[in-house]
UniProtKB/Swiss-Prot annotation:
PROSITE patterns cross-referenced by the UniProt entry: DS_RBD (PS50137), RNASE_3_1 (PS00517), RNASE_3_2 (PS50142)
Xref: PANTHER family: RIBONUCLEASE 3, RIBONUCLEASE III
Residues annotated for Mg(2+) binding in this entry: 40, 113, 116
Functional description taken from the UniProt entry: Digests double-stranded RNA. Involved in the processing of primary rRNA transcript to yield the immediate precursors to the large and small rRNAs (23S and 16S). Processes some mRNAs, and tRNAs when they are encoded in the rRNA operon. Processes pre-crRNA and tracrRNA of type II CRISPR loci if present in the organism.
Protein name (Swiss-Prot/TrEMBL): Ribonuclease 3
UniProt domain DRBM: residue ranges: 154-224
GO CC, one annotated term: cytoplasm
Protein keywords: Cytoplasm, Endonuclease, Hydrolase, Magnesium, Metal-binding, mRNA processing, Nuclease, RNA-binding, rRNA processing, rRNA-binding, tRNA processing
GO biological process: mRNA processing; regulation of gene expression; rRNA processing; tRNA processing
Gene behind the chain: rnc
Organism in which the protein naturally occurs: Hahella chejuensis (strain KCTC 2396)
């Protein structure tokens, strides 16, 4: 075990009995040979259960849909990448030369996948209870801020339901432009709706984020939101 990986383990708050699991969890498919995709698959499932179990116990009056939206907020790629950056996970990743040169160690999806892989690795190395303890510790500050007011449906869903209830055509989203390097792109999206003379627009670090912002502007233009 190198001093570098020992530093990462201190940040994670967990020391592996089988260090090879940690090395595998940090190995992107671009590196060649065995990679972390299977651990990512396992970690994704373990993470979803840990967060679901926590939310089920904490929000006893919450409906299924509310619990699902709270969980989605916690396990989405943006959140996972944020936590990965708190551990400086990018500097420990094993990437192929091309992926490294293109800034893959900063890419949100790669960081999020690596964090899920580490969760899967801890689960295999120590079992569910230890893994759950670590995950809840990493997510603690974010979990404490959750409340049922956070379960409102996202802007795209609300806009779609508003239009469907009035038997109107669904919104049309179009990417106007994509700017920046692959690891730090900015998407500019237009949303067109029958009945609104002007299209609304939104920008974000992904197409999904930009579409959500454009939908929010449409809700404001329609007078649904204030």
């Amino acid at each position: 075990m190198t001093a570098k990986l020992e530093r990462l383990q201190r940040a994670l708050g967990y020391t592996f009995k089988e260090p090879a699991l940690l090395t595998l969890a940090l190995t992107h498919r671009s590196f060649g040979g065995r990679n972390n995709e299977r651990l990512e698959f396992l970690g994704d499932s373990v993470l979803n259960f840990i967060i679901a179990d926590y939310l089920f116990g904490r929000f006893e009056e919450a409906r299924e849909g509310q619990l699902s939206r709270l969980r989605a907020r916690m396990v989405k790629g943006v959140t996972l990448a944020e936590i990965a950056r708190e551990f400086d996970l990018g500097e420990y990743l094993r990437l192929g030369s091309g992926e490294m040169k293109s800034g893959g160690f900063r890419r949100e999806s790669i960081l999020a996948d690596a964090l899920e892989s580490i969760i899967g690795a801890i689960y295999l190395d120590a079992g569910f209870e230890v893994c759950a303890d670590r995950v809840l510790n990493w997510f603690e500050a974010r979990l404490q801020k959750l409340n049922l007011k956070d379960t409102q449906k996202d802007s795209k869903t609300r806009l779609q339901e508003y239009l469907q209830a009035r038997q109107l055509n669904l919104p049309r989203y179009e990417v106007i432009s994509v700017q920046g390097e692959a690891h730090a792109q900015t998407f500019h999206v237009r949303c067109e709706i029958d009945g609104l003379s002007d299209a609304t627009e939104g920008t974000g670090s992904s197409r999904r984020v930009a579409e959500q912002k454009a939908a929010k502007q449409a809700l404001l233009a329609l007078g649904v939101d204030q």
